[in-house]
Amino acid sequence: MGVYKDFVFVSFNPQAQPLEDYLAGAKEYIDLIVEQSPSGRMEVIRGTQEYDIRANWKLLVENSFDDYHLMTTHSTWLNYMKRSGVEIKKPERGHLMPAHGVGKALGNGHAVIDNINFRGRPVAKWIPLYGEEAKPEIERIRAELVDRLGEARATRVADTNRNLVVFPNLVLNDGSSITIRTFHPLAADHMQVRAWALGPVEETSKARAIRLDSFLTFYGPGGFATPDDVEALESVQKGLATYREVPWSVMSRGMSKVEEQLNTDELHLRAFWLRWHELMAPTFEE
């Protein structure tokens, strides 16, 4: 067992490397989550989302930090945000939302997409959807961040979203809410998903209400996004099972680039699969 910033990790491998070595570059993104609390203490908020998906678990890994599908798969949610007064700007880099996004491999199979926030954050970016009555509270949280962390770090914490995959099956979505998601295979084409909301222990009832509303609106079996994703993954699984003459899932976006990878490229997806192959290939040879 190892603990990093109050995140507890357990391995059944007696020869597992030290946790901080294993987390590698993922530590930076866990730090950005924990720094949202003035005391550095976060709490799992009461309540669990639990549902099954009839698809291979690794498809949900891909989905969890794939920004390429956002504009088409979640168009209903984007239209809802626009009607609610949220400004959705045309990307300045690439051709898809969000603007300014990058994808990064973080070592040991961990990877992340990191992009500019447009959908609001309880810590601490106000949007019209929150209502005018929430603006003073968000501004207070923002001021505390700047005072504690400095302007540059506060901007990094409050104005960017991050979807982090800690290999193999832990997802930390740090956006309009913070979601802890994990999933376990029940069969080659069936997984069980569990998710929880995370928030600062000091959070006021007003900020907590915004957080939970954002969490339920986007994520979960009744949200705007998760039903879209479940339908997509189950359709992909059916297709892969039916068309066996197509042996590969192409994941080559950005492969020839030498410059920084966009969030809509697939470097971060390939990082996961390279580590998976590294661990699994000896088994196949045996």
Spell out what each predicted region is.
Residues 2-286:
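C-terminal catalytic domain of Rieske-type non-heme iron oxygenases
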